[in-house]
Amino acid sequence: MIKRQKLKYKWMLITTLITFTTILLFCLIIIFFLKDTLRSSEIDEAERSSNDIANLFHSKSLSDISALDLNASLENFQEILIYDDKGRKLIQTSNDNTLAYDNKIDFKHPERIHIHRSHGINYLVITEPIRSKEFSGYSVLVHSLQNYDNLVKSLYIVALAFGLIATIITAGVSYIFSSQITKPIVTMSNKMNQIRRDGFQNKLELTTNYEETDNLIDTFNEMMYQIEESFNQQRQFVEDASHELRTPLQIIQGHLNLIQRWGKKDPAVLEESLNISIEEVNRITKLVEELLLLTKDRVNHNVLECENVDINSEIQSRVKSLQHLHPDYTFETHLATKPIQLKINRHQFEQLLLIFIDNAMKYDTEHKHIKIVTQLKNKMIMIDITDHGMGIPKADLEFIFDRFYRVDKSRARSQGGNGLGLSIAEKIVQLNGGMIQVESELQNYTTFKISFPVLN
């Protein structure tokens, strides 16, 4: 199993290796070119001395040339050896007594320039033939490369030291920098562990002055807010659903106990208890169906068969049916003169109409006047449903589409609602690309404005 590394150590290791490698390569390249330049300079210096010696033999005879004359043509750390044609050494002189070159020269196959190592020191050796009127032989110039080699070694040591110092500095800076970068990540990790232990607390308060990590913190805070909100909604949903199911179950249980005690002998009690129990079972069934509908997602919606629905005809059909059931209500319709086609599942649209009209009727028990308007405006299909009932307080407007939320909680059960209708309606509208707006004034009116885009 591969051992996991901390991000800051991994970051520090990578940046340090990259920096060290870069500096090392850079120094090696510089040393390579500098070494080549210095070597050329050493060769040029030896060439000049060798040429001066050759010119000296062309201007003077061998007997007139002294050791001082030869030394005057030499630079520091150089030695000159003069041989005749037979390879006999005639003169050997140097301006540096520390030179210890003792290699024999092969005059049959002489190399003009070569490097020879003697006693641990490299020497540049230049062999030149001398042909003058009075002398014929060879000059051998020995140029010590000890200073050159020492300088190159020093350059390597300096480069290595510089690389190590730069590496240490880079490692320190990388550690500090990576610690600053990973600090919000570590803090968020600790925060998540705290949330796991203690539940949701305050948001993460941290500023790093780095755009990426600050965005990460903002995203984390937003995500935690959404998770907390979702968690609270889920908890509230479970509590509300439990409450909604508990009430009819308690009623059913009470009437079953009543039947067990007296209903066996009293047909009236039996009939009443059975009717109430059936009504509560129907209420539970409807509640479960609506809860299942709310859990359906867009994938399930895509499976539904959609068709072009004439919304004016559907509204007229629903209003006609409701008028027969509720003759005491007035349904005022102002429908668009031209047919309006909406691509939607017909059952969903019928359910949508019934939810809004039923909701309007529940909260308009005094005037009993429901107004429905349709129009086509700015490539949008508009449906307005207005009641003249109790209205909705402004503080409640943002919550009316929440599950189990009721404006008038004291009257909700007597009106037969369970607080899921508007949540279902909102989901149907959203799944079909529409939107809902609400306008309301207390003790005056409430208008639900439903709009759908016109699709070609």
UniProtKB/Swiss-Prot annotation:
Autophosphorylated. Residues 179-232 form the HAMP domain. Its main location: membrane. It comes from the Bacteria. It is found in: Cell membrane. It is an enzyme of class 2 (transferase). GO terms for cellular component: plasma membrane. CDD domains: HATPase, HisKA. SMART domains: HATPase_c, HisKA. The keyword Transmembrane helix applies. PROSITE patterns: HAMP, HIS_KIN. Keywords: ATP-binding, Cell membrane, Kinase, Membrane, Nucleotide-binding, Phosphoprotein, Transferase, Transmembrane, Transmembrane helix, Two-component regulatory system. Pfam families: ArlS_N, HATPase_c, HisKA. It is a multi-pass membrane protein. The chain crosses the membrane at residues 13-33, 157-177. The keyword Cell membrane applies. Residues 240-456 form the Histidine kinase domain. SUPFAM superfamilies: ATPase domain of HSP90 chaperone/DNA topoisomerase II/histidine kinase, HAMP domain-like, Homodimeric domain of signal transducing histidine kinase. Its EC number is 2.7.13.3. It catalyses: ATP + protein L-histidine = ADP + protein N-phospho-L-histidine. One of its GO terms (molecular function) is phosphorelay sensor kinase activity. The modification Phosphohistidine is found at H243. Member of the two-component regulatory system ArlS/ArlR. ArlS probably functions as a sensor protein kinase which is autophosphorylated at a histidine residue and transfers its phosphate group to ArlR. This is Signal transduction histidine-protein kinase ArlS. It comes from Staphylococcus epidermidis (strain ATCC 35984 / DSM 28319 / BCRC 17069 / CCUG 31568 / BM 3577 / RP62A).
